[in-house]
């Protein structure tokens, strides 16, 4: 895993949740972990990792993920045993 992806993962697990994580960095992290990122209708995205799916909407007009999305990702990664 590249240092950029490691920093993104550490930011997701930081407490309290940060709302300054760029959504495209999250997409890159999922791909670096061997997952798949698919864009659905509108701004909906499907993240697939280790046989599990997570649905999120790309924030707009901002490019940063919202805090609740970061918290959901943290819980999903924790369930999949993906940790920094």
Please describe what each predicted stretch is:
Residues 1-84:
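Basic nucleic-acid-binding interfaces
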